């Protein structure tokens, strides 16, 4: 019996086909890909809600709400596909903050967790980390944290905050913090005095845009530059 895929897993499988067809260009066309996926998702969800005798207008609203909860994890899966082959070739591993928040971690992940905690005096907290890249040979060492966001909407200070906290600790100051985003709302893509672009460009180690049109700078680059910058950490 075939496994029933969760929505983000299904989108991940669809992206693998999209990637196979378009190669590296797939990552600069994420907006087109997700528009197609959203249309299919809406159609399927609305049909399901209608079968449960929900009025069409209400079904559309529910489908839209469902998509909002799916898109974030789906984008993370797509970026994981981008970095996965790189990590395999270079004997690196990937985890995330959700996994590290679990109890009874195996020794390796427990060490990763301890080496990424941020000290707040009487308590230590995990920084946000959608994708955490680390190596285990000759010892566990965290190389980079990737924050993956579809858009920001006044949340642009979250990742820079964690970068500052990590930089202030001896054990974590080497960790690079990168932002990966399609920037669907044009909040950081173009030069100007937008706080979001200024803050992230100044505080983060790199911002990688999954789109074709944007103003490039030393730190704000295309998503295809991400792998080269990760190689520099080896």
Q: Model features per residue range: what roles?
A:
Residues 168, 182-234:
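Domain-level recognition of nuclease-like catalytic cores that cleave nucleotide substrates
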Residues 156-173:
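Short, charged, amphipathic alpha-helix that recurs within catalytic cores of restriction-modification
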Residues 149-155, 184-187:
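Short acidic, S/G/P-rich loop/turn micro-motifs used as interaction or catalytic elements
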Residues 57-117:
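Acidic-basic catalytic patches of nuclease active cores, encompassing PD-(D/E)XK
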Residues 131-133, 143-150, 159:
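Conserved catalytic cores of phosphodiester-cleaving nucleases, focusing on short active-site segments
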Residues 1-66:
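Nuclease-adjacent, charged terminal/linker segments that flank catalytic cores
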Residues 103-127, 135-140:
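Flexible internal linker/loop segments at domain or repeat junctions
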Residues 144-145, 173-181, 205-207:
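Hydrophobic beta-strand segments of well-ordered beta-sheets in folded domains
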